[in-house]
Regions:
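Hydrophobic anchor at the beta1->P-loop junction of P-loop NTPases
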Residues: 3-5
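The Walker A (P-loop) glycine that initiates the GxxxxGKT/S ATP-binding motif of P-loop NTPases
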Residues: 7, 111
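ATP-binding Walker
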Residues: 10-11
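Walker A/P-loop
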Residues: 14
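Post-Walker A helix-loop "phosphate-sensing" segment adjacent to the P-loop in P-loop NTPases
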Residues: 21-31, 44
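ATP-dependent small-molecule kinase phosphotransfer cores
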Residues: 33-107, 117, 133-138, 146-159, ...
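Phosphate-binding beta-loop-alpha motif at adenosine-nucleotide cofactor sites
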Residues: 124-125, 168-184
Length: 201
């Protein structure tokens, strides 16, 4: 059983997904960490991007409950992660890894940019977390000092790439987290899950 949490950079989806997983007693996977790890591998290895990204995609596996290393959110990773993520073969490998992991556990909250639209389009539990550009810039500044221009550029790249672009799945429930606390967003999601018939303690 998969609860899909999608949204743009710094929308708050990671904090929401992590907290939701704890509340539900499910596993939690940050799919973006896999792509960031692949990007780090490319930059550190000084190898041809496509070959290095493919090697990284095969090497890394979902690690539920393990927090991504802070270095994966450095500016240099931010600047290249979308390009690495756009390699179709990389997305194919990591998508299969994510699906295989989900099949191995009773329940998982998985967050990213295409979880509900491409990785698990069949799940009835899809959520898209958004926030204003100003709020997102404030949140990201605490991680890597990125400003609104950086986020706008990332949004453009993510939403216009050919392979699994950032889109809102047709049946996803959209939540604007700009003025909500993490608990507020999680509470809204749990309410929707109950309406859809999911047993939530």
């Amino acid at each position: 059983m998969v609860v899909a949490i999608d949204g743009p950079a710094a929308s708050g989806k990671s904090s929401v997904a992590r907290t939701l997983a704890q509340r539900l007693g499910y596993g939690y996977v940050n799919s973006g960490a896999l792509y960031r790890s692949a990007t780090w591998f490319v930059l550190e290895g000084g190898l041809e991007a496509r070959a290095a990204a493919m090697a990284a995609a095969h090497a890394f596996t979902p690690a539920p409950g393990v927090e991504p290393d802070p270095s994966l959110f450095e500016a240099r990773i931010n600047a290249h992660v979308s390009a690495v993520s756009s390699v179709p073969e990389v997305r194919a490998v990591l998508t299969e890894k994510l699906r295989s992991f989900a099949d191995s556990v009773p329940g998982v909250v998985m967050e990213g940019r295409d979880i509900g639209s491409a990785v698990f389009p069949q799940t009835p539990y899809k959520f898209y977390i958004d926030a204003s550009l100003e709020v997102r810039a404030q949140r990201r500044a605490g991680q890597a000092g990125a400003g609104s221009d950086d986020l706008q550029a990332r949004d453009r790249t993510d939403s216009t790439r050919r392979t699994s672009p950032l889109i809102i799945a047709e049946d996803a429930h959209v939540i604007d987290s700009s003025r909500l606390t993490i608990d507020g967003v999680v509470g809204e999601i749990i309410g929707r899950l109950k309406l859809k018939g999911l047993a939530v303690a």
